[in-house]
Curated annotation (Swiss-Prot):
EC numbers: 4.1.99.22
Gene label: moaA
Protein name, entry field: GTP 3',8-cyclase
Entry keyword Iron-sulfur: yes
Similarity comment: Belongs to the radical SAM superfamily. MoaA family.
């Protein structure tokens, strides 16, 4: 990777070159680990406009960011999202523009997103059972999501990745089937330990926790897992399958194998808070900077640079412990 003299370096000498941007807190699903069933969403005036989102993206790319991931809520329910993708994708120096989606809108938007310059998709898929999928998402239609997954492949997306949050007693018996689903479609799949964000009522996190080591041990009974050194510039650790050359299995393990030492990313909430760590509340209000100093990229750049001293070395998630972070995942950016 080329060095940029303006690159963002935090207090622990970690280069920050990956920005996760939430473009909306709204979603057409109500996943049990992500938000409350009666979630109250932000009024429009409190969220960043598409132009403000672009201005932040432009500044980060100018400061050496090489990967941007658009998240939500569900990013595809934000009006104007395809046009925003096209503008961000065209920024000189950006290598990857990725998106995390629940897949519900990909049937109609996969091709426009690909044409706009989105390079990769992550699609959430927590169950292959229609009823269980509905229970976990509260409102989701499995057939619609599968159609969206297939539409992404037809549109030309490569290395599409499925994301599965593993909940013991709810979907952990589907692990092998989910991998086989990924193999059949030549997709990658990542299993994620649930992150303790927001107070939920659907399950007890301590009881539903399933570690990445346990998931890997179960999969090893059916597949030959070969550890890989490949990276997607994010927190996932990957294994290849001897049985399937075109599928990788990844693990994101915030509890059992935290990835803080090599953290290269920050998050922008749709409210304009620049979060320096997923598991801490250290943040800077970029919305205030954008609105108090419109059309002043130097002030925005200074705020971004000054924020880095707030980035902690690590989070301190605890399985089953008292919730320390009250914001839900949809407010953070999944």
């Amino acid at each position: 990777m080329e060095q940029n003299s303006r690159a963002l370096i935090d207090g622990f000498n970690r280069k920050i070159d990956y920005l996760r941007m939430s473009v909306t807190d709204r979603c057409d699903f109500r996943c049990v680990y992500c938000m409350a069933e009666d979630m109250q969403f932000l009024p429009r005036q409190q969220i960043l406009s598409l132009e403000e989102l672009f201005q932040v993206a432009e500044r980060f790319v100018a400061l050496g960011t090489r990967k941007i991931r658009l998240t939500g809520g569900e990013p595809l329910v934000r009006q104007g999202i395809v046009e925003l993708c096209g503008r961000i994708a065209a920024l000189p120096g950006l290598r990857e523009l990725c998106m995390t989606s629940n897949g519900s809108q990909l049937g109609r938007l996969a091709q426009p997103l690909f044409d706009a310059g989105v390079t990769r998709l992550n699609i959430s898929l927590d169950s292959l059972d229609t009823d269980r999928f509905k229970q976990l998402t509260r409102t989701g239609d499995l057939a619609q999501v599968v159609a969206g997954i297939d539409a992404a492949r037809q549109a030309g997306f490569k290395r599409t990745k499925l994301n599965c949050v593993v909940l013991k007693g709810r979907n952990d018996h589907e692990l092998v089937d989910l991998v086989r689903f990924a193999i059949d479609r030549e997709l990658d799949i990542t299993f994620i330990e649930e992150m303790p964000l927001g107070t939920i009522s659907e399950h007890e996190r301590g009881e539903s926790f399933c570690s990445s080591d346990e998931v890997r041990e179960r999969l090893a009974g059916q597949f030959t897992l070969i550890e890989s050194t490949e990276s997607s510039q994010g927190p996932a650790r990957y294994w290849r399958l001897a049985e399937a050359a075109n599928t990788r299995v990844g693990f994101i393990s915030p509890h059992s194998h935290n990835f803080c030492a090599t953290c290269n990313r920050v998050r922008l909430t749709v409210e304009g808070r620049l979060l320096l760590c997923l598991g801490n509340e250290h943040s800077v209000d970029l919305k205030h900077v954008l609105r108090a100093h419109p059309g002043n990229p130097e002030r925005l750049e200074k705020a971004i640079r000054d924020s880095l001293h707030l980035k902690p070395y690590r989070h301190h998630f605890e399985v089953g412990g008292e919730v320390q972070i009250l914001r839900f995942m949809n407010m953070t950016g999944g």
